[in-house]
């Protein structure tokens, strides 16, 4: 298997604690539908020495989560060392997005500018809350202050996303 280009990879999940004695692991999926993570391949795991292949041999729902067994994890002893390992795929294996639709990984790193043309910071991450996703915006060199912000990812809040320019415009006052 050819080594991946790290710049073309996107994180889609993470391995969690072992399940059972045969090397199975809990899998935390960052895909919109939890089981959709298994429709993408090949998987890559990020290690201290670079990206290595991670091959799913079987998976299943277990309670409210999902567990999987991997070719590279023969037993529980190895599984114990895998907790926290991130799962990556090549972005080229993803379907194209529609207009005004974005992969969260494409939004991370964008500058966030409000309607008053003030830089509020940079998108560090997005996370789901139930009602709607939230962008964690952290101060940047160009931001108006040193305040981190939690800004809803919502059509009433986000006016413009310009991936090419590396910025988004939001309807968000500096003192919200």
From Swiss-Prot:
Higher taxonomy: Bacteria, Pseudomonadati, Pseudomonadota, Gammaproteobacteria, Moraxellales
Alphabetized Gene3D superfamilies for the sequence: PRC-barrel domain (2.30.30.240), RimM (2.40.30.60)
Compartments, as annotated in UniProt: Cytoplasm
Domain PRC barrel intervals: 99-176
GO molecular function: ribosome binding
Assigned GO CC terms: cytoplasm; ribosome
GO biological process annotation, one example: rRNA processing
Species the sequence originates in: Psychrobacter sp. (strain PRwf-1)
NCBIfam families the UniProt entry points to: 16S_RimM
UniProt name for this protein: Ribosome maturation factor RimM
Predominant location: cytoplasm
Keywords: Chaperone, Cytoplasm, Ribosome biogenesis, rRNA processing
Function recorded in the entry: An accessory protein needed during the final step in the assembly of 30S ribosomal subunit, possibly for assembly of the head region. Essential for efficient processing of 16S rRNA. May be needed both before and after RbfA during the maturation of 16S rRNA. It has affinity for free ribosomal 30S subunits but not for 70S ribosomes.
Quaternary structure, from the entry: Binds ribosomal protein uS19.
Domain notes per entry: The PRC barrel domain binds ribosomal protein uS19.
Family designation: Belongs to the RimM family.
UniProt key word Chaperone: yes
Pfam (any one): RimM
